[in-house]
A protein has these predicted regions:
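Short, Gly/Pro- and small/polar-rich lid/capping loops
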Residues: 8-51
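Glycine-rich, N-terminal phosphate-binding loop and its surrounding beta-alpha-beta segment
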Residues: 50-122
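General beta-strand structural signal in soluble alpha/beta enzymes
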Residues: 95, 152-153, 176-182, 248-251, ...
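Rossmann-like adenosine-cofactor binding region
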Residues: 254-344
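Adenosine-phosphate binding glycine-rich loop
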Residues: 10-15, 210-211, 315-425
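Glycine/serine-rich phosphate-binding loop and adjoining beta1-alpha1 elements at the start
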Residues: 85, 105-219
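Glycine-rich phosphate/diphosphate-binding loop of Rossmann-like nucleotide-binding domains
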Residues: 191-295
Length: 425
């Protein structure tokens, strides 16, 4: 499999914006992209930084910093999650917004790319403090969001309750209920059936398609999953039901291994009761770093960025890597995995189940008509299977790896839209 040549220096390796830009640049060169379009697509259209006060429970006033980056909206409203974490940076949000542009284009849904975040430690904040912070953040960016401008969604440390607060705040400002300003909402206020497990379901679909493409069988296929949150746990549960053997679960505080397969339903119940997978008796405690490089057919990084780097890429033994997380593989590691001929389903395809289901939710909200879960799942799987075929055919036709093919396909679609619309000036 040809390498991507998407080079960055070692000290830039874990900067997500540098990594994304390196991949974009290489794909754009392969496309012979017009220099003007290259400039348009490489740069975010809008970057919003807000600093705002929040009254804490003890009477103190704390200042918080929030971001919303809208990378490109040529194909439709911006679309992307909002994350709450102490380590959120503008570069991270900028990269994630760009990935959303390419992700939406790869699966051919009518959204552009956006992302948001607030620098905060949710573990040290009460529910009331989180609500006040969320509502104030929403009010600070309210002129730039909306069903036809930029649609928000859950991400790291945010959930359907966060989306309900954002939707309510926006609606109060508009003077009427606007459910379609966010996706990932509770069902009773315009959420969609099937949305919660959609990203995990999409990961399973991409694993199925990878095995089909490589003429490998599901039976006996050993899988290691890094991360057991929403994406990882749902992917594990659905894949276990399909006949995959989930032999390893790697989490931040430790991992689990069972060569005969982990009982995923029991593990989900155990984590729900205890808040951790540590201590689960149905598997052997194993350092997470060891699990990433253990023997398996499929490795699914499904938690955070920069999990596969130059430090461990040469030790990866998996035949297939399906990226359930955003940016789990650095550009430097990409080169190493390509040399090892590891089949990669890149993040902008592998975890696109979430944004695809979000698109369905947005459509249902705007129609005021809601689908059965079976319809959501059927439509989701059809789009993701077709998108897999699009990417691998593009890779074969252009003699590039899957990641660069996905970027090229996405860039080509967005660039074509811009050329059709023209530059307003």
């Amino acid at each position: 499999m040809p390498t991507s040549n998407a080079k960055v220096s070692l000290d830039q390796e874990i900067n997500p914006w540098e990594a994304q830009s390196a991949r974009f640049d290489f794909a754009a060169r392969k496309l012979n992209l017009d220099e003007g379009l290259w400039k348009v697509l490489r740069s975010p259209a809008r970057e919003i930084i807000v600093h705002f006060p929040v009254s804490m429970d003890d009477g103190r006033i704390e200042m918080f910093t929030g971001f919303r980056v809208q990378h490109n909206i040529a194909r439709g409203p911006g679309k992307g999650g909002v994350r709450y974490a102490p380590e959120v940076t503008l570069d991270e949000v900028r990269a994630l917004a760009s990935w959303m542009t390419w992700k939406c284009a790869v699966v051919n849904i009518p959204f552009g790319g956006a992302k948001g975040g607030v620098i905060c430690d949710t573990k040290s904040m009460s529910k009331g403090e989180l609500e006040r912070m969320t509502r104030r953040y929403t009010s600070e960016i309210i002129d730039f969001i909306g069903p036809e401008k930029d649609v928000l969604a859950p991400d790291v440390n945010t959930n359907e309750q966060t989306m309900a607060w954002i939707m309510d705040t926006y609606s109060m400002h508009m003077g009427h209920t606007v459910t379609s300003v966010v996706t990932g909402k509770p069902l009773n206020i315009g959420g969609s059936r099937g949305r919660l497990e959609a990203t995990g379901r999409g990961v399973m679909v991409e694993c199925d398609e990878s095995l089909r493409y490589l003429n490998m069988a599901i039976e006996g296929c050993r899988v290691v999953i890094q991360g057991f949150g929403n994406v990882g746990s749902n992917a594990a549960r659905l894949m276990k039901e399909q006949g995959y053997k989930i032999v390893g679960i790697a989490e931040k505080d430790g991992g689990l291994y069972n060569s005969n397969g982990i009982d995923i339903h029991q593990l989900i119940e155990y984590k729900y009761r205890n808040g951790t997978t540590l201590g689960f008796r149905g598997a052997e405690a194993t350092p997470s770093e060891e699990l990433l490089v253990s023997d398996c057919e499929i490795l699914i990084p499904a938690a955070t960025e920069n999990v596969i780097t130059s430090r461990n890429a040469d030790k990866i033994k998996a035949r297939i890597v399906v990226e359930g997380a955003n940016g789990p593989t650095t550009a430097v590691a990409d080169e190493i995995l390509a040399e090892k001929r590891i089949f990669i389903v890149p993040d902008i395809l592998a975890n696109a189940g979430g944004v695809t289901a979000s698109y369905f939710e947005w459509v249902q909200d705007r129609q005021g008509y809601f689908w059965k879960e079976a319809v959501v799942n059927e439509q989701l799987e059809t789009i993701l299977r077709d998108s897999f075929d699009d990417v691998v055919r593009y890779a074969e036709a252009h003699n590039v790896n899957n990641r660069i093919a996905a970027y090229m396909l996405a860039i080509d679609r967005v660039a074509y839209t811009i050329k059709q619309r023209g530059i307003y000036a």
